[in-house]
Amino acid sequence: MTPEELVHAARAWRDEDPDPETRSEVEGLLGPAGGGTPDVVALVDRFGARLQFGTAGLRGEMGAGPNRMNRAVVIRATAGLAAHLAATGHAGQPVVVGYDARHRSDRFAADAAGVLAAAGFPVHLADRPLPTPVVAFGVVHLGCCAGVQVTASHNPPRDNGYKVYLGDGAQIVPPSDTEISARIDAVGPLASVPRAAPDDPRITATGDALVDAYVAGAVAQATAPDARDLRIVYTPLHGVGRDVLTRVLVGAGFAPPVVVDEQADPDPDFPTVAFPNPEEPGALDLSLALAREVDADLVVANDPDADRLAVALPDPAAEGGWRALTGDEIGIVLADWLLARGRGSDRLVVTTIVSSSMLARLAARRGVAYAETLTGFKWLARAALDRPELRFVFGYEEALGSCVGTLVRDKDGITAALAFAELAASERRRGRSVLDRLDDLATELGVHATGQRSIRFEGVDGLARMRAAVDGLAAAPPVALAGVPVAEVEDMRLGTRLPPTDAVVLRGEGVRLIVRPSGTEPKLKCYAEAVVPVGARAELAAAREHGRALVATILDDAVAGVT
């Protein structure tokens, strides 16, 4: 766009924007009313591109313009979603709309509900901030044709998002994303989009009933009621998980968790953490300090919308006496625990291409079905839905996402926390810890060391620069990973094994590197794995050290190669 075109686009946006806050933002960028120079750089960032609606819905920084999350973008997106639902035979069927506790989430949810109701869809609108798993559960429980959750999960405070579920309770996958995106593009002037008033009878509050039903379903999944002697420290990281998680744990027979007071209440500014992501360094510092103070047995943490679970365990060998598990460690030990509670070869466990290969080995040893999918829980849920002849037991991704059973067809940090608490209590009753069980698995299946690095690409050209980096890796891959010759290069954009995706996989004997763009943030992710066989339990420490060194070298070389 030329500067003149940018100014014209910004003025047109301002004139139809229903939000005085973002209207004022645009006016400031255009310059004083009596004259002045427009801020072209800021206008390019807001109006030179637009947020792309994809399988993750929408997610981005809040502000004015089509490349930001704002009321106008939400109204257009919802009008497109309503048109898609009507065109696919769901006219007049109910939709559930929820939201987290971020800035503007309640306003965006109200706008979405108003558009859907005016389009003829009865709306179940949350009357309070809710965990994302509760809203995903509500799609099926309430008999809806779709669900919308306004959330940016663990993104920085400046961000928000718009997540869409279809009637099976799973996130959208292609081609639904492109079909909805096309409907959004076809939306006319904002004034042409009808919006029902908040008191419209087609909009009803979810009230307590939805949360009550979710809690009952979660508690019904619990087993091993004789093992409940556990002191748990919990943090919702300033998010919305506390009340529901506490009800689930207490309902299953555990004592109420000891909650980190400074992070107990929802706060959209996340003041005690640099990023509200339990994977980030420092995010669990307050939890671990409290755990040492109260002599806890387990630390569990949710991200702000409670769809992810982080875990830490007492470990005398770790710095500070506590060790935070990786997403792969949480996933593999939960899978082993859940498989041990049942029988049958018709059971299914699922993970993603960037997660550890250890789950595949575990499934083979336990004689159960295994599926591997593209990154993202939308694909894990589909793997279960596409195999109705199998009983889905568990799915996980390395980014702290887990799905226990079929209550929720998305990642759920609350039911995962319950399952992990049961596992920890059961091991404690036997005089062991979860770390002992992880040692058992490493001895049986080999040490699977994993790690990742992220490279951020800021600015309006960030996506283009990320794609160029992936292109370069596929065209000229390294000949070795940490000294191990590369035996295979898989360009997953070709879709030969799974649906096409922006990723390149390099494999060698016992080593692997995957490079892919993030689906929700402007960054390139590099995932490494090194598998080290173990002959005896006494070899574990050396094998783990060797695996960590291999992974670090692979990642160092990968970052150097794409920057």
Predicted features by range, described:
Residues 5-112, 204-229, 240:
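An N-terminal, well-structured beta->alpha segment
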Residues 13, 17-21, 42-51, 160-285, ...:
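Gly/Ser/Thr-enriched, mixed-charge loops and adjacent short helices
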Residues 47-67, 152-155, 236-248, 304, ...:
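Conserved phosphate/anionic-ligand binding catalytic regions in large, soluble enzymes, centered on
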Residues 91, 96-159, 248, 253-311:
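N-terminal small/polar loop signature for handling phosphorylated ligands or for N-terminal nucleophile
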Residues 108-116, 159-166, 245, 307-330, ...:
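Short Gly/Thr/Asp-enriched flexible loops that form oxyanion-binding sites at enzyme active sites
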Residues 165-194, 328-347, 351-361:
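Glycine-rich phosphate-binding loop plus the immediately following alpha-helix
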Residues 292, 296-298, 319-323, 341-517, ...:
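Phosphate-binding and adjacent anionic-ligand microenvironments
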